[in-house]
Amino acid sequence: MAKWNMIPSAEGPFKGLDAMARYCFGLLYNRYQLSMRKHSEGDSRFSEVRTVRLCDAFPYRPSMRNDTSEISMSYAFCIYTQGDLAREMGCTDRTVRRCLEDLRRAGVIETKREGYNGALRFFFPPVVYEYFVREERLKEYNAILAGREG
């Protein structure tokens, strides 16, 4: 049976990342969306309360760019072991570690180790969420314009 995964194109926050790193991001983001669904249904197993500055939580909102006050927010995360990622991607653990480091450096994921020698928790910073929301709004706007012209 065929399996399809989302791989972001090399633009926006993904510019400069190689195809393997973007493929790794696609797998992580797919699992993250499942965690978000559970989180929105009230399941707290895949969420963590974090204290963040408003300017970091909402980077694309001009009114909050310089606001350094802190708030507590509930963040969803996903868990993926490096071994599982390597099997999904068809590569070695070393390649997965390199991809994760590239994604961290690009600022599109944040990680936190779950206990000693445990799996990583993957968080997606607001920059990534805002990027995808903006892209969806742009598609909707273009569809409306195309409908008016047709």
Describe the residue ranges of each PLM region:
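Winged-helix/helix-turn-helix nucleic-acid-interaction surface
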Residues: 83, 92-149
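Short, well-ordered coil↔helix boundary/capping segments
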Residues: 79, 89-90
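Residue-level marker of alpha-helix boundaries and capping positions
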Residues: 73, 90-91
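Short, Lys/Arg-enriched, disordered terminal segments
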Residues: 1, 149-150
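Functionally constrained cores in energy, signaling, and assembly domains
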Residues: 22-26, 91, 104
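Short recognition helix of helix-turn-helix/winged-helix DNA-binding domains
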Residues: 1-83
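The alpha-helix within a helix-turn-helix
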Residues: 86
